[in-house]
């Protein structure tokens, strides 16, 4: 029984941590509860909070663009259908109008009045649709202005941070590196250097 428990604890300790994309499961050991635990953030250490917020704003902007495009396509489909219905009714009305008034039957006169009323209602409906599209366009312009102001405010501190980090890197490059023997890096070391402090271009 003790052997099984010892084996179970050993296997549990060697069990690899799960990964969810760039997020690694936090290591949790029962025997270390009394000591200080190293908590690793779920976010990539190469991104600052301002950069994360800016990236989220860009994603939100992309989502809004897709929603707008869907709305535009719906407006277009409704407008095409309304125009088609109006043209069909007008064609039928023209055929009735071409008949001399004295030769028209009572049903034909009633149908002519019905067509005029239907065409009038459809024209009004299309006018409402055009007005709604114009209101939507003005609202989108206001949203674009607000988003542009937001991005401009958020990009200013990031530009300062980028310039500061670039100048610090330039100062570091100016210092001569200490001489040390050349050692060939393994694949794991190359990956670590590639994805350490800056975002990997390959990823």
Curated annotation (Swiss-Prot):
InterPro entries: bMERB_dom, C16orf45-like. The gene is Bmerb1. Residues 3-149 form the bMERB domain. This is bMERB domain-containing protein 1. It comes from the Eukaryota. Residues 161-184 are annotated as: Disordered. Disulfide bonds: none annotated. GO terms for biological process: cell motility involved in cerebral cortex radial glia guided migration; microtubule depolymerization; negative regulation of cell motility involved in cerebral cortex radial glia guided migration; negative regulation of microtubule depolymerization. GO terms for cellular component: microtubule cytoskeleton.
């Amino acid at each position: 029984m003790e052997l099984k428990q010892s084996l179970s604890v050993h296997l549990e300790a060697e069990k690899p941590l799960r990964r969810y994309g760039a997020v690694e499961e936090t290591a949790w050991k029962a025997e270390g509860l009394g000591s200080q635990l190293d908590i690793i953030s779920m976010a990539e250490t190469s991104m600052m909070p301002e950069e994360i917020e800016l990236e989220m704003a860009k994603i939100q902007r992309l989502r809004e663009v897709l929603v707008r495009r869907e709305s535009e396509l719906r407006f277009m489909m409704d407008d095409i259908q309304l125009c088609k219905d109006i043209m069909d009714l007008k064609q039928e009305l023209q055929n009735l109008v071409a008949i001399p008034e004295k030769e028209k039957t009572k049903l034909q006169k009633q149908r002519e009045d019905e067509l005029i009323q239907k065409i009038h209602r459809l024209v009004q409906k299309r006018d409402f649709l055009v007005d709604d599209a114009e209101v939507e366009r003005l609202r989108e312009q206001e949203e674009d202005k607000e988003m542009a102001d937001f991005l401009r405010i958020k990009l200013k501190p990031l530009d300062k941070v980028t310039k500061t980090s670039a100048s610090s890197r330039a100062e570091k490059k100016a210092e001569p590196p200490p001489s040390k023997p050349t050692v060939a890096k393994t694949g794991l070391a190359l990956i670590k250097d590639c994805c350490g402090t800056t975002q990997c271009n390959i990823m």
